[in-house]
Amino acid sequence: MGKEKNPRRVAENEAMAKLRMLRTSPQKLNLVAAMIRGKKVGQALTDLTFSNKRIAQDVKKCLQSAIANAENNHNLDVDELIVAEAWVGKNLVMKRGRPRARGRFGKIMKPFSELTITVRQVEEQA
């Protein structure tokens, strides 16, 4: 509970961005995250822009934040970045209910997720 004892340190050629409390299930978020893993950031941004999934816009926002972190905080070249990791985790689950027939009560779970995107600079081979 609380803070991690040893937070993960990023390498010299990496940058990271996190989004927490995303209002979607981890399973649905992982479908979009799997779509961009290992791709160049330009191609990943294009894929997210034209995706029909609702959560794709939030993933795009997190990826743009990771790119900005790489450029401004780590002085990395944006044209040589790839999506090294797109990690999805489970967050809290809001529990709601709905009255059902014969006096019963149906449980409704409203899951939240978190997303961590790591971008890495790779040198192009000629």
Curated annotation (Swiss-Prot):
Function: This protein binds specifically to 23S rRNA; its binding is stimulated by other ribosomal proteins, e.g. L4, L17, and L20. It is important during the early stages of 50S assembly. It makes multiple contacts with different domains of the 23S rRNA in the assembled 50S subunit and ribosome. The globular domain of the protein is located near the polypeptide exit tunnel on the outside of the subunit, while an extended beta-hairpin is found that lines the wall of the exit tunnel in the center of the 70S ribosome.
HAMAP family (alphabetical): Ribosomal_uL22_B
InterPro entries: Ribosomal_uL22, Ribosomal_uL22_bac/chlpt-type, Ribosomal_uL22_bac/org-type, Ribosomal_uL22_sf
UniProt key word Cell cycle: no
Pfam family, any one: Ribosomal_L22
Entry annotated with the keyword Cytoplasm: no
NCBIfam families (UniProt xref): rplV_bact
Natural source organism: Ruegeria pomeroyi (strain ATCC 700808 / DSM 15171 / DSS-3)
BP GO annotations: translation
Subunit structure: Part of the 50S ribosomal subunit.
Swiss-Prot/TrEMBL keywords: Ribonucleoprotein, Ribosomal protein, RNA-binding, rRNA-binding
The family this protein is said to belong to: Belongs to the universal ribosomal protein uL22 family.
Protein name as catalogued: Large ribosomal subunit protein uL22
